[in-house]
Amino acid sequence: MLRIADKTFDSHLFTGTGKFASSQLMVEAIRASGSQLVTLAMKRVDLRQHNDAILEPLIAAGVTLLPNTSGAKTAEEAIFAAHLAREALGTNWLKLEIHPDARWLLPDPIETLKAAETLVQQGFVVLPYCGADPVLCKRLEEVGCAAVMPLGAPIGSNQGLETRAMLEIIIQQATVPVVVDAGIGVPSHAAQALEMGADAVLVNTAIAVADDPVNMAKAFRLAVEAGLLARQSGPGSRSHFAHATSPLAGFLEASA
């Protein structure tokens, strides 16, 4: 069971809504993933009506919506988008995204921290997308963010956990949930994130652009479950030396 702020989730896999070939395929994949928290870019939906092609099926699916501020380049733009989302969707939950460079889509740490502090004070449950910077993640936690969402690699790159060393530090020091966001390309990446201690992963591109998004969503669901179970089972420690699983010494001595 995963708890973030006032909500609990059985699934440790969060999903996105972008890049799917159709809204129907998007919903089928989300259902197959078992995800209970789904991100939604405000720039992609018509907030004036709940029968929007993306919004309506998500509401019908009964998932928790996590509007994001993707497209915002400054703290001010993100705060403005956050208030639009709260008014339209009736939720205080927000994935804070500020990335001024359209080529790399890397989060702006200064603007993100600035916006996070303001939004928390205004009553939002803030989940910030950020670089895998342990110092920044701690600062975001200190200003009241409900979770932190450090990247594994650039958005949509499918490179996996390129920031693993920094993610391990973030996980070790965090007192709020850590959700690895961006760059996860195959189910094994998700399993590794859960094994190393992440509380959840957010996956969008890897599912949406797969030849079979529904089955890929199932694969991610199973990978996250496997990674979590492996961590909870207490894996053995690593060693530089070999350790025989079936020592022969006693057997040979007895047979001499």
Curated annotation (Swiss-Prot):
The active site is at K95 (schiff-base intermediate with dxp). One of its GO terms (biological process) is thiamine diphosphate biosynthetic process. GO terms for cellular component: cytoplasm. Its main location: cytoplasm. The keyword Nucleotide-binding does not apply. Keywords: Cytoplasm, Schiff base, Thiamine biosynthesis, Transferase. InterPro entries: Aldolase_TIM, Thiazole_synthase_ThiG, ThiG. Catalyzes the rearrangement of 1-deoxy-D-xylulose 5-phosphate (DXP) to produce the thiazole phosphate moiety of thiamine. Sulfur is provided by the thiocarboxylate moiety of the carrier protein ThiS. In vitro, sulfur can be provided by H(2)S. Homotetramer. Forms heterodimers with either ThiH or ThiS. Belongs to the ThiG family. This is Thiazole synthase. The lineage of its organism: Bacteria, Pseudomonadati, Pseudomonadota, Gammaproteobacteria, Enterobacterales. The gene is thiG.
